[in-house]
C-alpha cells in the first residue's frame, strides 16, 4: 500500500471492480509492437503503407481491448494541448506579423493565394492527423500496463525484430542483395540499413542494444535461460552492426550515452558490483575492438574530434549542422507561437538560408526538437517537454521494484533516441517514431490491479478509445489502399506523384493534358517546386503560353531563391524556344552560385562559369551576353578574357581599377591568359612598365625560356622557385662497397649511378615514373640532367610539378 501511495499513477480501487484478465493488455501491446516493427521494415519505400499498417494495428487494439486502467487526466490535457498548439498554423496569416519573404510571394502570378500561416495546409492537416493518431495510440498504450513477466516477452519480441533488421541489413550489404522495400533512387542512399538516412538505422539499433541490456539483466536474475540465450546474440548483432557496418558516428556516441543512462538510473539496489564489473569489462573489450579495427564510424568520429589523418577541422569547425541550427532559430523567431505548420520546414527553410546557404535544401533542421519548435511553435515544444517530464517522473516511483532494470532499459532506449533528437532527426522518419512510441508506452504505463474500475471516467475513456480506434482503422485502410491499390495518395506524397505523371504525359507528347493536370494540382500542392517546372516545360514544349511558362518558372525560382541549379535548368529549357531568355537566367544562376561559394557551400565559381561559356559558344548572342556577368569577380573576368575573341588584353591592362583588384594568384592567371592569347610584345611592354608584377610573371618567363629551347635555364628557374632538390643523395663508402643496394629508391638509384650502372638506375626509376609517382618523376629528371638531356629533364620535371599540383604554366 505504501508503494501505491507513492505513485501518482495508481488509482484507488472502487467497489464495483470487475475481473479483467491481464493477458488482454499483453495482447494489445504485442499488436502495437508488431505494427510498429512492420512500419520500420517498410520505411524505406512504402511510407503510406507502413503508417497504414500501424494505424490498422492500433485501431484494432483500441476497438477490441478496453483499457486496463484509467489514464490520468493530466496526460490527456497535455496531449490535447500539443495537438491544439500544432494546429495554430492553420489560423489566418493576417492575424500575425507577416515576414517580408512571404509578402514577396504575393507578386508571383502562378503562386496560389494562401491565407493561412501554413503554406501547405493540406500537408499540415495530414501531419496533424498523424500526430493525433500517435497521441491516441500512446495514451492507449499507457492504459494497458502489463505485468513484469509479460513485459519480458514483449520486450524480447521487439529486440528480436531489431536484431532481425540488423541481420538483414548486414546480409544485404555483404552480398549485394536488394532489399525489396527500400528505394535506392534517392540522391544519397545509405549503404547500410533500409532507412533513407544512416542515423535512422543507428537509432533503431541503439534502442535495440539498450533494450537487450535490460533483458539480459532480467533473464539472468530471473533465471530465464531461453530469454538469456536469445537476448545475448541479439545484443551482439545490434552492437556489432552499429560499430562495424553503420557509418553513423551519432549511433556510436548515443550507444554510450544510452548504456550510461541505463546504469546511472538503475539505483543502488539493482546496480550491483557484479553488474558494474561485467559492464566495465564488456565495455572495455568492445571499445578496444572498435578502436583497433577499421571502420567508417570510427574514422568519422576521429575526424569530428580533429584526430583523423584526413581531418581538416576540429570539433564543430565548419560544421553545417550548427549553421542549420542558427538559420532555424530565425524561423522560430518569426513564428514563435504557431510555427510554420507541420510538414513545411523544407518549404520555408530556403527563405532563411544564410549561414547554411547551399544548393541542396535541408528537409529538416538536424534536430527533432528544433523541428517541432519551427513547425509547431514554442508552446507545442514546451508541452511536449512537460508531457515527457511527467511520464518519466511518474515512472520513477517504481525504481525499487524487482522489474525496474528491464522497465528502465525500455525507458532508456526511448529516451536515448529522444536525446539523439537534439542533434539529429531519428524521429523525423515517422515509421521509426512508431517504434519509439510503443517503447515509451510499454515502459511508462504503471502496473495496476488486475481489475478495472467501471467508473464514469473509465467509460468515457473506453468510448474515446473506441472512437479513436475506429478512426485509426479507417485511416489505416485508406493509407494502405493509397500505397498498394492505386488510390489517390495523401498530400505529402501527392505532389511528387503528379510531377511524375506530368513528365510521363510530356514524354508521350500529350502536352495539353500535362498542362491541365499541372494547373489543377497547383491549389492542392502549392509548395511542390517541381510542379512549376513541369508546368513551364509543358507550356514551352506544347507551344502554349510563354507568359504562363515565365510565370511558372518565376514561381519555382521564388520558392528556392538560393538555388543555382533551378535557373540554370530553366535556361536550358528555353534554349530551343527563346534563347534570349536563357542569358538572364544563367546570370541569376551565376550570382546564386557566387553566393553559395561565399557561404562555403561549394567552390569553383570559375569552373562553373567556364562550363556556361562552353555551352553558350554555339550561340553567339548568348555567349556575348554571358560576358556581362564576368564583372561578378576578377576571376570571371580573366576567364572571359581568355574565352572571348573580342576582348583586347591591352585595353584591359589599361584599366587601373581592374588591375588593383587582382590578388597575386589572379595576376598570374591574367598574365598566363594574355600570353596564351598572343600580343607578346604588348605583354613585354606591360611587364617592363610594371616591375612589381615581375614576381607573378615567372610562369610566363619560364614559358619564354622554353620557347627559346632554354630547358636548362627553365629547370633552374623552377628549382629556385620551389626550392627543389635535383640531386642524388650522397652515400657512405661502406654502402657503395656493399653488394646489396639500399632499399630506398633515391639511394638505390644513387648506388647504381655511383657504380657506373646508369642502365640499371634508369630501369629502377622507370616503374615509379610510369606510375606517375612524384619521387620517380623527380629521379627521372635528375638522371636526364646527368645524361645532358635537358629537354627530357624538363618533361620529367613538368610531370613532377603537375603531380604535386604546382604545374601552372601558359
Summary of predicted features, one role per range:
Residues 13, 20-45, 51-64, 83-86, ...:
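Alpha-helical transmembrane segments of multi-pass inner-membrane proteins
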Amino acid at each position: 500500500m505504501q508503494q501505491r501511495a507513492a505513485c501518482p499513477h495508481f488509482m484507488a480501487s472502487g467497489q464495483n471492480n470487475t475481473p479483467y484478465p491481464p493477458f488482454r493488455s499483453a495482447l494489445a501491446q504485442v499488436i502495437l509492437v508488431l505494427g510498429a516493427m512492420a512500419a520500420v521494415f517498410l520505411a524505406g519505400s512504402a511510407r503510406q503503407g507502413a503508417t497504414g499498417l500501424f494505424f490498422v494495428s492500433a485501431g484494432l487494439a483500441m476497438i477490441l481491448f478496453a483499457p486496463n486502467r484509467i489514464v490520468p487526466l493530466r496526460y490527456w490535457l497535455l496531449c490535447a494541448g500539443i495537438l491544439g498548439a500544432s494546429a495554430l498554423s492553420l489560423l489566418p496569416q493576417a492575424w500575425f506579423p507577416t515576414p517580408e519573404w512571404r509578402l514577396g510571394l504575393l507578386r508571383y502570378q502562378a503562386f496560389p493565394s494562401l491565407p493561412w500561416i501554413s503554406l501547405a495546409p493540406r500537408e499540415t492537416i495530414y501531419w496533424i492527423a498523424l500526430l493525433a493518431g500517435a497521441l491516441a495510440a500512446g495514451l492507449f498504450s499507457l492504459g494497458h500496463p502489463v505485468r513484469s513477466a509479460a513485459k519480458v516477452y514483449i520486450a524480447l519480441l521487439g529486440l528480436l525484430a531489431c536484431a532481425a533488421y540488423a541481420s538483414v541489413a548486414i546480409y544485404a550489404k555483404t552480398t549485394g542483395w536488394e532489399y525489396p522495400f527500400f528505394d535506392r533512387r534517392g540522391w544519397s542512399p545509405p549503404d547500410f540499413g533500409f532507412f533513407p538516412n544512416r542515423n535512422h538505422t543507428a537509432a533503431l539499433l541503439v534502442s535495440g542494444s539498450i533494450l537487450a541490456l535490460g533483458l539480459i539483466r532480467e533473464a539472468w536474475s530471473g533465471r530465464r535461460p531461453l530469454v538469456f540465450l536469445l537476448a545475448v546474440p541479439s545484443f551482439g548483432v545490434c552492437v556489432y552492426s552499429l560499430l562495424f557496418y553503420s557509418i553513423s558516428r551519432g549511433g556510436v556516441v548515443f550507444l554510450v550515452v544510452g548504456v550510461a543512462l541505463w546504469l546511472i538510473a538503475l539505483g543502488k539496489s539493482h546496480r550491483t558490483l557484479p553488474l558494474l564489473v561485467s559492464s566495465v569489462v564488456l565495455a572495455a573489450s568492445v571499445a578496444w575492438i572498435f578502436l583497433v579495427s577499421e571502420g567508417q564510424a570510427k574514422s568519422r568520429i576521429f575526424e569530428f574530434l580533429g584526430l583523423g589523418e584526413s581531418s581538416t577541422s576540429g570539433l564543430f569547425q565548419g560544421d553545417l549542422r550548427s549553421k542549420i541550427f542558427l538559420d532555424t532559430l530565425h524561423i522560430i523567431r518569426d513564428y514563435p507561437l504557431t510555427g510554420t505548420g507541420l510538414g513545411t520546414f523544407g518549404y520555408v527553410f530556403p527563405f532563411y538560408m544564410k549561414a547554411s546557404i547551399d544548393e541542396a535544401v535541408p528537409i529538416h533542421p538536424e534536430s527533432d526538437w528544433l523541428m517541432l519548435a519551427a513547425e509547431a511553435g514554442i508552446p507545442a515544444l514546451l508541452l511536449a517537454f512537460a508531457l515527457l517530464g511527467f511520464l518519466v517522473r511518474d515512472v520513477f516511483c517504481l525504481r525499487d521494484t524487482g522489474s525496474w532494470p528491464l522497465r528502465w532499459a525500455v525507458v532508456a532506449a526511448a529516451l536515448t533516441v529522444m536525446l539523439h533528437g537534439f542533434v539529429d532527426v531519428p524521429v523525423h522518419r515517422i515509421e521509426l517514431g512508431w517504434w519509439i512510441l510503443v517503447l515509451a508506452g510499454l515502459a511508462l504505463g504503471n502496473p495496476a490491479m488486475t481489475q478495472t474500475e467501471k467508473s464514469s471516467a473509465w467509460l468515457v475513456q473506453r468510448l474515446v478509445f473506441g472512437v479513436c480506434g475506429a478512426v485509426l482503422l479507417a485511416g489505416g485502410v485508406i493509407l494502405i489502399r493509397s500505397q498498394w491499390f492505386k488510390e489517390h495518395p495523401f498530400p505529402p506524397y501527392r505532389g511528387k506523384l503528379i510531377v511524375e505523371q506530368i513528365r510521363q504525359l510530356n514524354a508521350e507528347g500529350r502536352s495539353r493534358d500535362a498542362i491541365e493536370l499541372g494547373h489543377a494540382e497547383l491549389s492542392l500542392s502549392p509548395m511542390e517546386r517541381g510542379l512549376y517546372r513541369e508546368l513551364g516545360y509543358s507550356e514551352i514544349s506544347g507551344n502554349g503560353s510563354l507568359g504562363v511558362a515565365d510565370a511558372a518558372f518565376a514561381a519555382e525560382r521564388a520558392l528556392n531563391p538560393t538555388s543555382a541549379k533551378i535557373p540554370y535548368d530553366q535556361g536550358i529549357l528555353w534554349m530551343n524556344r527563346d534563347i534570349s531568355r536563357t542569358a538572364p537566367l544563367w546570370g541569376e544562376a551565376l550570382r546564386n552560385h557566387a553566393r553559395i561559394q561565399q557561404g562555403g557551400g561549394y567552390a569553383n565559381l570559375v569552373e562553373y562559369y567556364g562550363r556556361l561559356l562552353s555551352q553558350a559558344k554555339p550561340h553567339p548572342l548568348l555567349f556575348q551576353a554571358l560576358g556581362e556577368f564576368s564583372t561578378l569577380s576578377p576571376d570571371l573576368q580573366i576567364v572571359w578574357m581568355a574565352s572571348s575573341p573580342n576582348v583586347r588584353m591591352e585595353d584591359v591592362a589599361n584599366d587601373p581599377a581592374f588591375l588593383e583588384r587582382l590578388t597575386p594568384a589572379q595576376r598570374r592567371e591574367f598574365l598566363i591568359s594574355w600570353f596564351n592569347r598572343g600580343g607578346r610584345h604588348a605583354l613585354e611592354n606591360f611587364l617592363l612598365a610594371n616591375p612589381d608584377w615581375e614576381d607573378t610573371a615567372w610562369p610566363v618567363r619560364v614559358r619564354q625560356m622554353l620557347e627559346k629551347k632554354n630547358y636548362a635555364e627553365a629547370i633552374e628557374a623552377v628549382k629556385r622557385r620551389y626550392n627543389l632538390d635535383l640531386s642524388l643523395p650522397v652515400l657512405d663508402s661502406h654502402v657503395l662497397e656493399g653488394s646489396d643496394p639500399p632499399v630506398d629508391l633515391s639511394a638505390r638509384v644513387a648506388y647504381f649511378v655511383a657504380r657506373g650502372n646508369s642502365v640499371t638506375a634508369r630501369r629502377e626509376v622507370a616503374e615509379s615514373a610510369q606510375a606517375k609517382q612524384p619521387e620517380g618523376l623527380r629521379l627521372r629528371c635528375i638522371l636526364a640532367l646527368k645524361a645532358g638531356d635537358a629537354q627530357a629533364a624538363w618533361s620529367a620535371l613538368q610531370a613532377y610539378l603537375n603531380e604535386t599540383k604546382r604545374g601552372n604554366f601558359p
